[in-house]
Amino acid sequence: MASDNLVVLNALDTARTQWYHVTAVIIAGMGFFTDAYDLFCISTVSKLLGRLYYYDPSTKAPGKLPHMANNWVIGVALVGTLSGQLVFGWLGDKLGRKKVYGLTLILMVICALCSGLSLGYSPKSVIGTLCFFRFWLGFGIGGDYPLSATIMSEYANKSTRGAFIAAVFAMQGVGIIFAGLVSMTISKVFLMNFEGKPFNVDEVLSTEPEADYVWRIVLMLGALPALLTYYWRMKMPETGRYTAIIEGNAKQAAIDMGKVLDIEIQAEGDKLAQFKAANEYSLLSNEFFQRHGLHLIGTMSTWFLLDIAFYSQNLTQKDIFPVMGLTSKANTISALREMFETSRAMFVIALFGTFPGYWFTVFFIEKIGRFKIQLVGFFMMSVFMAIIGVKYDYLRNKEHKWTFAALYGLTFFFANFGPNSTTFVLPAELFPTRVRSTCHALSAALGKAGAMISAFGIQQYTQDQDVRKIKTAMLLLAFTNMVGFCCTFLVTETKGRSLEEISGEDGRQNETQMKTTRPVSGHPDDGWE
């Protein structure tokens, strides 16, 4: 009820949607644009790196990254992301969201630029330098996950909060599209001026020397969106919930949020003690486990399982495209042509499969709810991956390539109109202000642990384009999604409720506590909602 809440928090919950909410989505969302661009553009350039630095004339085949080098080039940013999520998530609760929010962008800008540099021209020096800077790039990207989600959830009104958080995350879809588009455009420009011969015509001249500039330009352009939003991110005030509930300064919260919402909010201190008392327990306390333990297990497990499947799809699609017939065989084209075709296929799949799913979530999350979207998404992903795995021999024939592409695209669609979006939204809503950023970070970090399994494990099944291994990988991912479907029952629906009502910060019991105190009879008058 509104009367149980602080005036400033009630003002945030009931405020009409206005321009400031939109700018907050853009400012926070550009971090995810950068995140997706930087993490996924490596898929478009990794084959080029192999042809440039690992060509062996004795093999009579185009150069490709050794398994270990390939895993580290792709996976090291995920290791950095996991580390950054934990560090910045904790700092966001201890120091405040705003104080550490700009540092993530600084890391992204510097390390994206440095990713295009290398110390020397030997394979070890180039790959070693690239991995070093991509780790710290991932570290900055990781910090953006808990901070952006928490800031958006604490700024938004309760009727559109899920849509706003999902819109921030949907910028990841835009970033994935641009990763393909930019790679495609730059490689095409170089092709128009420096195209080499097909590999089966001339093994040496098929790898254009100018291609060494292409991958560097693609990676360095990832700094641009982060750089453009740094000033506006620094102009954002601390969230009213953190200022009021954690810092105990209801007056400053009222001033800051009054400016943001362009309304006058009365400062209120008499209810502040109630909220601070409800927030005193720590993350490792028995009280936290009783109140929120199942929810934390639910958000961590579902994000972990989702990212095994989602990152496996994104990071290995470059290996599956030739099997689908969407790109030419490597030994029939030049290095730049291979990058162009891989980028084009990635762009098409993202545009028609990945991108729409994000925005379906934005438009329907407040109507259908987080819980149902996540359940259906996990289930449909499992169905389509199982079909691909079982019918793989049939689908890999060239005459069925568009059926294959449609099924593959639908798995992306239901990942994003499903658990890839909702696993980001739910941890930003389920937990109390004092530990909200940390709990989101823990959930996201488990997700990146799943992504690391895909980068260092699942890729072993697809990199050699072995039919039996790819079938095994798809069936394994289908099973993983069904486990995620089951783990979804550990979380609860959050739509239409204030953050304080969901977490029990307003002095009332949250849903986990209600389950332990509801009477067996279950009559409405006996305490059921």
UniProtKB/Swiss-Prot annotation:
Intervals, Extracellular compartment: 43-71, 121-125, 183-211, 313-344, 396-405, 459-471
Keyword field contains Transport: yes
TM region(s), chain numbering: 22-42, 72-92, 100-120, 126-146, 162-182, 212-232, 292-312, 345-365, 375-395, 406-426, 438-458, 472-492
Residue numbers spanned by region Disordered: 501-529
GO MF entry, a single one: symporter activity
Sugar attachment sites: N314
Protein induction: Regulated positively by RAM1 during arbuscular mycorrhiza (AM) formation after inoculation with AM fungi (e.g. Rhizophagus irregularis and Glomus intraradices).
Key word Membrane present: yes
CDD domains, A to Z: MFS_PhT
Mode of membrane association: Multi-pass membrane protein
Catalytic activity: phosphate(in) + H(+)(in) = phosphate(out) + H(+)(out)
Alphabetically ordered keywords of this record: Cell membrane, Glycoprotein, Membrane, Phosphate transport, Symport, Transmembrane, Transmembrane helix, Transport
GO cellular component: periarbuscular membrane; plasma membrane
Domain of life where this protein originates: Eukaryota
Subcellular location: Cell membrane
Skewed-composition ranges (Polar residues): 510-519
UniProt cross-references to Pfam families, sorted A to Z: Sugar_tr
Task of the protein: Low-affinity transporter for external inorganic phosphate (Pi) probably involved in the acquisition of phosphate released by arbuscular mycorrhizal (AM) fungi (e.g. Rhizophagus irregularis and Glomus intraradices) during AM symbiosis. Acts as a Pi-sensing machinery at the root tip level, independently of AM fungi, involved in the regulation of early root branching and lateral roots formation.
Anything else known: Although related to the sugar transporter family, it does not transport sugars.
Family: Belongs to the major facilitator superfamily. Phosphate:H(+) symporter (TC 2.A.1.9) family.
Protein name per Swiss-Prot or TrEMBL: Low affinity inorganic phosphate transporter 4
Source organism of this protein record: Petunia hybrida (Petunia)
